[in-house]
Swiss-Prot record:
Membrane topology field: Lipid-anchor; GPI-anchor
Catalytic activity: Random hydrolysis of (1->4)-linkages between N-acetyl-beta-D-glucosamine and D-glucuronate residues in hyaluronate
Name the record gives this protein: Hyaluronidase PH-20
Residues carrying a glycan: N46, N165, N293, N368
Disulfide bonds: C60-C351, C223-C237, C376-C387, C381-C435, C437-C464
Subcellular location, record wording: Cell membrane
A GO molecular-function annotation: hyalurononglucosaminidase activity
Keyword presence, Disulfide bond: yes
Function of the molecule: Involved in sperm-egg adhesion. Upon fertilization sperm must first penetrate a layer of cumulus cells that surrounds the egg before reaching the zona pellucida. The cumulus cells are embedded in a matrix containing hyaluronic acid which is formed prior to ovulation. This protein aids in penetrating the layer of cumulus cells by digesting hyaluronic acid.
A GO biological-process term: single fertilization
Protein EC: 3.2.1.35
GO cellular component terms, semicolon-separated: acrosomal vesicle; external side of plasma membrane; membrane raft; plasma membrane
UniProt source species: Mus musculus (Mouse)
Amino acid sequence: MGELRFKHLFWGSFVESGGTFQTVLIFLLIPCSLTVDYRAAPILSNTTFLWIWNVPTERCVGNVNDPIDLSFFSLIGSPRKTATGQPVTLFYVDRLGLYPHIDANQAEHYGGIPQRGDYQAHLRKAKTDIEHYIPDDKLGLAIIDWEEWRPTWLRNWKPKDNYRNKSIELVQSTNPGLSITEATQKAIQQFEEAGRKFMEGTLHLGKFLRPNQLWGYYLFPDCYNNKFQDPKYDGQCPAVEKKRNDNLKWLWKASTGLYPSVYLKKDLKSNRQATLYVRYRVVEAIRVSKVGNASDPVPIFVYIRLVFTDRTSEYLLEDDLVNTIGEIVALGTSGIIIWDAMSLAQRAAGCPILHKYMQTTLNPYIVNVTLAAKMCSQTLCNEKGMCSRRKESSDVYLHLNPSHFDIMLTETGKYEVLGNPRVGDLEYFSEHFKCSCFSRMTCKETSDVKNVQDVNVCVGDNVCIKAKVEPNPAFYLLPGKSLLFMTTLGHVLYHLPQDIFVFPRKTLVSTP
């Protein structure tokens, strides 16, 4: 196998519409942030951004012909029911306690609705299940996947409205004299109180038994910004849904991890709507993470899939990775969980296809975005915080500059990064990103990145950028008189095309 070179052209616009001189002078004008923005501290040392693998690919790992390279993933766990003692534990409905719910065939389990559930029996069974699936209290993620009903009454729309109907019927059976309006109001109160009791109590039990696990619910928070058919779709979370999330303050305060999802359907393939959809779901998760304590937010781990939910044989393209992974990293979260069903590795030729996709598409992008994020964190935050967009709505990403860096896949199957950072790369970070300090750390944003001399960042199995920061090409003029130098520089910049630093968002893979 020869070497493969991945020329990542994801970097986005370096020069904006304000004029080329703005690029030269803006870094002298940017003030230090007057307010501190916080993010959750890393759960693993030297790991600004955490990659988590939650796909049942055991049969692919170690396969001599088509090994799956998981060296970039710090936490690996299978969602199989037989898997125990993993750093990532996913509790489905049948794996944690006696969760009251109604199945797709309308059969009621453990009371059906939470008001009829046996809470104490649920806790006893949940204790046994937690001790079974997490036998030791080691650091890890504990995600509860309860999707049958939602704790907010009004969010139980069709087909979940059977929970509302049965709740009203329960009230009417014990209070026949109530009007439908009165019965509905009482049903809302009973349902939401019982739902909260089950969800909040289960979190408290988990934290008591396994305090080193980060406990939370899959799909929480959500903001239902999925009306893609609206011609005015802008991705923003509806105000009413943000208000409903505010009313779930008890849930955010009880959670030690937040696990929103940004799975894509085929209609969002290489689509601007996907960018907006992911962006504002993550923005809402960041907002919610600070409800309990703005200076000590809850860590956010965003669920993604490598395939489209309604076309599971089709993998995400490079643009789709930017729309998901690129957005998540640029906004400043704790990590990404890649999940999928057993079919991903069990289809005919599933392992070879997954292996090739990871080798040529996913892993090179992980190398790219992780090293860029670490470089930015090291430059702006002295590794005491993570970089996040100054303006959340801007289309800027934490990517290596394709003019200066190549990512190579060597004959040994390892990745190597060629190239050195330049001052302009660091200035790009400083212009478009701010330092969001890690909680419980004293953090001050670097005011002048021109003073940064070295970059030393690594990812995975020793894939690193360790280099001196090179000056921008213009500085090689070494002017004898500053006025002559600035006149010459201004003349050169004036005649440069406005899009000189605008790169297409595609990846070129070539064999030298």
